[in-house]
Amino acid sequence: PLTAQENSTAKVDESVDWDVFAEKNPKQCWAVSIPKKTVNTRNGRVVAVRRGDIALMVVYDPKAKVSGQIVFTGGYPFAPGSTVDVTIDGNKFALYTKDEWAWANQGDDAKIIAAMKKGAKAKLTARSSRGTRTEDTFSLLGFTAAVEDADKLCK
């Protein structure tokens, strides 16, 4: 989805801190945001690191029977076997990782989306394959409207 976003001219809406994209062929829709704050640490010290695109998304892909899938890319390869910890106003969830991508377990997508609709911010904490700890904080202002738009566009 992020590659599609980068190459897409199909931005159809923006809702405060979230954007909505929709592609027609194949039909895919997603709500996406970039972090408001990023902190990278190694051995407890703040470090400057190069990262690719960082984005938190909710994806809808009717052909693949995907409806409201949480997807995160941290802009680097995650440590093998690690998880991304998601904290939304005290509620904690884990995303599983593969390479530069992370997803919720299928049963958790709806729970995370519900928490995001009620919350003000989401903090995602992860570890790179080089041992860097990253903390990305996303605003949830406009999340509900963006997710509802993406869902409707892909019905």
Locate the predicted segments by residue:
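A generic "folded-domain core" signal
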Residues: 2-155
